C-alpha cells in the first residue's frame, strides 16, 4: 500500500496507544483519530503529534466518521470496557449500539477498506460488523486470540529458555473463557512442545491457565490492558501494508461454524487470504465446538 491512511475509531487508552505503536513502527503516512469525546481526542492528537519527529508519518489528525470512509485501514476500538461482574451478553448489548451507530455514519465506505475490530466481545462484534457492511467478510476481522497466543508463547519461552519467535503455538476459539490451547499442534523447530521433559500435563495446564488469567491480573493492578493489544494491531497492520501474509490467529468468519472465532489465517493486503488447516486432537475439536456454542449464545 502506498501513502497508507489509517483511521482509529475510539481514541481511548487502546486507540491512542495503537496510534503510538503505528507511528513508532513507521506504518502510516496519515493517522486520523475519531472519538465521541472531542476534547479527549484533541488531547491525544496533540500529544501524539510530538512523536512526528521520530516517525515517517506525515500527519496525525482528529476527524469524524465521514472523514475516514476512504481509509485503507479502519481500527475499531470504540466501546465500553467490561465491568466487574458484567456478563458477555450485557457487554455485547451495550457495544452493539456503538458499532451500529458508527458504521451507519461510515457509509458509504470505500470498497477496498480493511476493518480491524478490537472492541469486546470481539468475536460477536466482528460478525455484527460484517453483517451491517457491504464489504467482503475477508476485509473485516478481529484481533481474536492473537494477544492470548503471544502471551502463551512468552510463557513457554521462559519455561524452556528459547526465543518467543521460535515457538509455534496458538490459543484458538473464542477470545474469552472457552478459548483453548492447541497443544497437539504446538512445537519448536518441529519438536512437539508436549514432548519436552519439563512439559508435563500439569505444566501445560498451568501455562494455559496463566495465559487465560494474565489479562485479569493486569486489570486488577491498573484497570485496563492496552500495550499488548496495541502491539498486536500494529503487527496486523504491518502484515496488511507490506502484504506479508503472516499467519496469525484472528477472529474471522467460518461458514461451516456460523460464527467468527480464531483459527490461524494468512493476513495480506486484501485482508484474510486463507485459513490454515489444523489437525486438532479429538478433545481440542470438542473445545472448538464449545467455543462456537458460547459465541452463539451471546
Q: Which residue stretches match the model-derived regions?
A:
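Long, compositionally biased stretches enriched for glycine and/or charged residues
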Residues: 157-298
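Conserved NAD(P)H cofactor-binding loop of Rossmann-fold oxidoreductase domains
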Residues: 78-80
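Glycine-rich Rossmann-fold phosphate-binding loop(s) that bind the pyrophosphate
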Residues: 11-12
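Rossmann-like NAD(P)(H) cofactor-binding subdomain of soluble oxidoreductases
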Residues: 87-153
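N-terminal Rossmann-fold NAD(P) dinucleotide-binding loop
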Residues: 15-16
Amino acid at each position: 500500500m502506498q501513502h497508507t491512511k489509517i483511521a482509529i475509531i475510539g481514541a481511548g487508552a487502546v486507540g491512542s496507544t495503537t496510534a503510538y505503536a503505528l507511528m513508532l513502527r513507521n506504518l502510516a503516512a496519515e493517522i486520523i483519530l475519531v472519538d465521541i469525546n472531542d476534547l479527549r481526542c484533541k488531547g491525544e492528537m496533540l500529544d501524539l503529534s510530538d512523536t512526528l519527529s521520530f516517525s515517517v508519518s506525515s500527519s496525525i489528525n482528529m476527524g469524524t466518521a465521514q472523514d475516514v470512509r476512504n481509509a485503507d485501514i479502519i481500527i475499531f476500538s470504540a466501546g465500553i470496557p467490561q465491568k466487574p461482574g458484567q456478563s458477555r451478553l450485557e457487554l455485547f448489548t451495550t457495544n452493539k449500539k456503538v458499532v451500529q451507530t458508527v458504521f451507519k455514519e461510515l457509509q458509504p465506505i470505500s470498497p477496498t477498506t480493511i476493518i480491524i475490530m478490537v472492541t469486546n466481545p470481539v468475536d460477536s462484534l466482528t460478525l455484527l460488523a460484517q453483517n451491517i457492511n457491504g464489504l467482503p467478510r475477508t476485509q473485516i476481522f478481529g484481533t481474536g486470540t492473537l494477544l492470548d497466543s503471544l502471551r502463551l508463547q512468552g510463557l513457554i519461552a521462559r519455561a524452556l529458555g528459547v526465543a518467543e519467535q521460535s515457538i509455534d503455538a496458538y490459543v484458538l476459539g473464542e477470545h474469552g473463557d472457552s478459548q483453548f490451547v492447541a497443544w497437539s499442534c504446538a512445537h519448536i523447530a518441529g519438536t512437539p512442545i508436549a514432548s519436552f521433559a519439563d512439559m508435563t500435563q500439569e505444566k501445560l495446564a498451568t501455562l494455559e491457565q496463566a495465559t487465560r488469567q494474565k489479562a485479569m491480573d493486569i486489570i486488577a493492578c491498573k484497570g485496563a490492558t492496552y500495550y499488548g493489544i496495541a502491539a498486536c494491531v500494529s503487527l496486523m497492520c504491518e502484515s496488511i501494508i507490506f502484504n506479508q501474509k503472516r499467519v496469525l490467529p484472528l477472529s474471522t468468519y467460518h461458514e461451516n461454524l456460523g460464527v467468527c472465532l480464531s483459527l490461524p489465517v494468512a493476513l495480506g493486503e486484501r485482508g484474510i487470504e486463507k485459513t490454515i488447516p489444523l489437525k486438532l486432537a479429538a478433545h481440542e475439536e470438542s473445545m472448538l465446538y464449545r467455543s462456537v456454542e458460547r459465541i452463539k449464545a451471546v
